[in-house]
Amino acid sequence: MKVLIKSAWGSGQPTEASFPFHHANAFAEAGHQVQVFLLGEAVSLMRTVVANAVVPVGWAPLSEALAKVIAHRVPIHV
């Protein structure tokens, strides 16, 4: 299945901002073709300093999820 995940959540909402990346990892690990599309505030999450500072409640830090997304070779469109 092909999946496109879009998000506009930025660092001000760390839990919501991390969901697209955690979901992308789950889809990729299940064998689906997945892409992430970021718009608005979410674009800032691609800055290393911002990604390192985003720690969602009850989930792994965004930097860890982002590293997995990159390892899965999931395209991220900004």
Model-derived features: positions:
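N-terminal beta-loop-helix "entrance" segment that forms/cooperates
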Residues: A42-P56
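A glycine-rich helix N-cap at a beta->alpha junction
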Residues: N52-V78
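Short, catalytically relevant binding-site loops at active-site mouths
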Residues: G10-G12, E41-S44
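Histidine-anchored nucleotide/phosphate-binding helix
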Residues: A17-A30, V36
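Short internal beta-strands
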Residues: V34-L39, I76-V78
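Glycine-centered flexibility sites
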Residues: G31, G40-A42, G58
